Curated annotation (Swiss-Prot):
Its main location: endoplasmic reticulum. PROSITE patterns: TLC. GO terms for biological process: ceramide metabolic process; cholesterol metabolic process; lipid homeostasis; nervous system development; phospholipid metabolic process. This is Protein CLN8. It comes from Canis lupus familiaris (Dog).
Length: 288
């Protein structure tokens, strides 16, 4: 299917010829470079302006900058996803095959972002000898899924945009973690943000159910428009999100509201009996 233009607008980034592989790949590279730039700028600004950031160890600084970068991407993804979910008539007319030029822009730049995420996460794992299985799986499936959409000119955009809307939780996750490290876990603002974040994770679960509904009612269109490996990858990834990853993360975020501990960097063994410090870390007891 030929990508459909929004129409009625002057020349813009959305009016490019997205049937051109050169344009799509250039935007993917631009997405990678832009979010790498966000990561670097966050490091520079935080180093200059934030005392909490300067007190963190190297691995926590990487996580801080990644959280901020994900939050920026989350804003882009939320705007695009909500427009597709609630407004765009072309995508609603054919949820399996409908396309829009503005969607091509977001799909291509999202591919660059998810490639950046995979590079950053795996470099961090190698440097600090860590490994988060759920995070690695989530980012691998996201990158391969969006890469498939960039490559395939016939792929519909509704489900891809719905997938981007799953990133709506990232700004709240960023705020939660940064405030926790700054020692604000007892503040009303942190607790309110935590409630909103938990709500967003529940919304993620509802959104995955909606995506299954779309797959069920538009199955023939999906089979005819997607390559079989791409469709299989999407269904497996959606299944993991629905049954494992979303429930696990929702549980952990709810648990964190009741017990404000930075479980991303919990100490491997207790060093003393002191309570949680300003950065939200406590010695982890055996058996927890």
């Amino acid at each position: 299917m030929t990508p459909m233009s929004d129409g009625g607008t002057s020349e813009s980034i959305f009016d490019l010829d997205y049937t051109s592989w050169k344009i799509r790949s250039t935007l993917a590279v631009a997405g990678f470079v832009f979010y790498l730039g966000v990561f670097v700028v966050c490091h520079q600004l935080s180093s200059s302006l934030n005392a909490t950031y300067r007190s963190l160890v190297a691995r926590e600084k990487v996580f801080w900058n990644l959280a901020a970068t994900r939050a920026v991407f989350g804003v882009q993804s939320t705007a695009a996803g909500l427009w597709a979910l609630l407004v765009d008539p072309v995508l609603h007319a054919d949820k399996a095959r409908g396309q829009q030029n503005w969607c091509w822009f977001h799909i291509a730049t999202a591919t660059g972002f998810f490639f950046f995420e995979n590079v950053a996460v795996h470099l961090s794992n190698v440097l600090f000898r860590t490994f988060d299985l759920f995070l690695a799986i989530h980012h691998l499936f996201a990158f391969l899924g969006f890469l498939g959409s960039v490559v395939n000119l016939g792929a519909g955009h509704y489900l891809a945009m719905s997938t981007l809307l799953l990133e709506a939780s990232t700004p709240f996750t960023c705020i939660s973690w940064m405030l926790l490290k700054a020692g604000w876990s007892e503040s009303l603002f942190w607790k309110l943000n935590q409630w909103l974040m938990i709500h967003m994770f529940h919304c993620r679960m509802v959104l995955t159910y909606h995506m299954w509904w779309v797959c069920f009612w538009h199955w023939d269109g999906l089979v005819s428009s997607l390559y079989l490996p791409h469709l299989a990858l999407f269904l497996v990834g959606l299944g993991l999100l629905t049954l494992v990853i979303n429930p696990y993360w929702t549980h952990k975020k709810t648990q964190q509201l009741l017990n404000p501990v930075d479980w991303n960097f919990a100490q491997p063994a207790p060093r003393s009996s002191r309570p949680a410090g300003a950065n939200g870390q406590v010695p982890q007891k055996k058996g927890q």
